[in-house]
Amino acid sequence: MPIIKSAKKRVRITEKRTAYNREWKEKIKQAIKEFEKVVEEGNVEEAEAKLREASKILDKSAGKGIIHKNKAARKKSQLTRQFNKIA
């Protein structure tokens, strides 16, 4: 355990940020899983809505620095390709 006051603060901040990042990454995974489930079922209208939702979450997380912007773009592209296969 840290002894210096500033080191203690850094530990607290790191724990908060880690929890925040983990929460957002879980949102991303959940949105992608929901989209893929709908795509598997073949429901085009619902898949389009889930694609928009997943894209929104990816963009927000990239803006917040949770994931890199190129990773967000790559994921969105992959999801769009999946959607285009059923559309």
Curated annotation (Swiss-Prot):
The keyword Cell membrane does not apply. SUPFAM superfamilies: Ribosomal protein S20. GO terms for cellular component: cytosol; small ribosomal subunit. Signal peptide: none annotated. Pfam families: Ribosomal_S20p. GO terms for biological process: translation. GO terms for molecular function: small ribosomal subunit rRNA binding; structural constituent of ribosome. Keywords: Ribonucleoprotein, Ribosomal protein, RNA-binding, rRNA-binding. NCBIfam families: S20. Binds directly to 16S ribosomal RNA. Belongs to the bacterial ribosomal protein bS20 family. This is Small ribosomal subunit protein bS20. It comes from Halothermothrix orenii (strain H 168 / OCM 544 / DSM 9562). The lineage of its organism: Bacteria, Bacillati, Bacillota, Clostridia, Halanaerobiales. The gene is rpsT.
